[in-house]
Amino acid sequence: MSNKPIADMIETIEHFAQTQPSYPVYNVLGQEHTYGDLKADSDSLAAVIDQLGLPEKSPVVVFGGQEYEMLATFVALTKSGHAYIPIDSHSALERVSAILEVAEPSLIIAISAFPLEQVSTPMINLAQVQEAFAQGNNYEITHPVKGDDNYYIIFTSGTTGKPKGVQISHDNLLSFTNWMITDKEFATPSRPQMLAQPPYSFDLSVMYWAPTLALGGTLFTLPSVITQDFKQLFAAIFSLPIAIWTSTPSFADMAMLSEYFNSEKMPGITHFYFDGEELTVKTAQKLRERFPNARIINAYGPTEATVALSAVAVTDEMLATLKRLPIGYTKADSPTFIIDEEGNKLPNGEQGEIIVSGPAVSKGYMNNPEKTAEAFFEFEDLPAYHTGDVGTMTDEGLLLYGGRMDFQIKFNGYRIELEDVSQNLNKSRFIESAVAVPRYNKDHKVQNLLAYVILKDGVREQFERDIDITKAIKEDLTDIMMSYMMPSKFLYRDSLPLTPNGKIDIKGLINEVNKR
């Protein structure tokens, strides 16, 4: 039976609370919470929130990790007409301060201990939330978040300047959710059993909670204290009865460091959903070897267009013939175009900037009209967004990714995509993972390219010195890479830094190289 679109997220959750009250919605390391619990707890907390007399539709910060109380609080806020701003408990203090400054929330709900002192915003802590649950208040839903009201606001992690709060409405959320639960590429099963690993402050989390709640499934979550410890992570992951794995490719690469991450040990996994960063052929091939029968989905999209706008199931033919995986067929309700530098639409096959339009496009950045005007506009009478990504559309309607416009550099007269360099480096038989980083001179011109490299197991022992490894890598890539793209310096690391969202922190490495 195919999944049907939903008309309202809260009404759908309420429906499952009535029809399957004892079915688990949330599982934290074996501790279960049911749809009945979620309704009762969110109702009771919504009643308490209403009593606070907050300004109508004002945003509320929710601070914490992957606790059940986070989800129940989100639902309570939606019922009581407030957008929520999730902030992960591992966020840097400066970032938390910057978000409060931009968002001006009417309330902070701190599921984890709030790290800032002397905050003027009213606050509710975990004990008070649990006390609200225990009151068992009934709640009549009369003023929920609906239509163009903000459902959630996620702050993107800009490394310079203030973070930008992307406002996602209930209509935006429905556009994404209904595509995901009905699209043939995702082929999402009913009652999905979903890994809930990415933090709620990262919009990849919407890719697990939205379809799961829309289809009456169960979220299996791992506290970040576990995901940050390899031994604990592997021990915990193998015990989870999950069918759908949702993460960045980097997190899957981390899981594949364990030989036990395979279909024999985890026979229940039927789907892998990837978004948030590029899925390489190399990672997908390794995953296909480990899970030969699982469906691997490569999805793409910016936070500003509600999680993702395109997706494709990776085929064996793609893995055998392509150097770079396509990023998907675009959503039917979200016309996606390629434009040139003058803003003209380009024909299929020509490379330019990816522009997305339609009902999933955000209304803009919270309290930031200047940045909103730069990135959001109208295109053919639809709300549209400049992704800042380079792409090409094929005649078959497949979107191809060409890298970030802001990761394009000019070096010795050549225009170079840093991601192209990284992709080519990763083709060396000596390299497990690598990224290319530019070093600038005082005039901000690119002086040279550096490569940060993780070597494959056993490679270092084959060579006496790093310089010999570098020579071997360069020889290995002679026929693959143009000489002007070859980094002049190779730095060997055991690991590469990740952002809090689990992506390789390229901007951080650029800052490190240039001592910013």
Curated annotation (Swiss-Prot):
Catalytic activity: holo-[D-alanyl-carrier protein] + D-alanine + ATP = D-alanyl-[D-alanyl-carrier protein] + AMP + diphosphate
Compartments (UniProt record): Cytoplasm
Protein's name according to its UniProt entry: D-alanine--D-alanyl carrier protein ligase
Source species: Streptococcus pneumoniae serotype 4 (strain ATCC BAA-334 / TIGR4)
Signal sequence segment: none
Entry binding sites for D-alanine: 203, 307, 503
Metal-binding is among the record's keywords: no
Gene name for this UniProt entry: dltA
GO biological process: lipoteichoic acid biosynthetic process
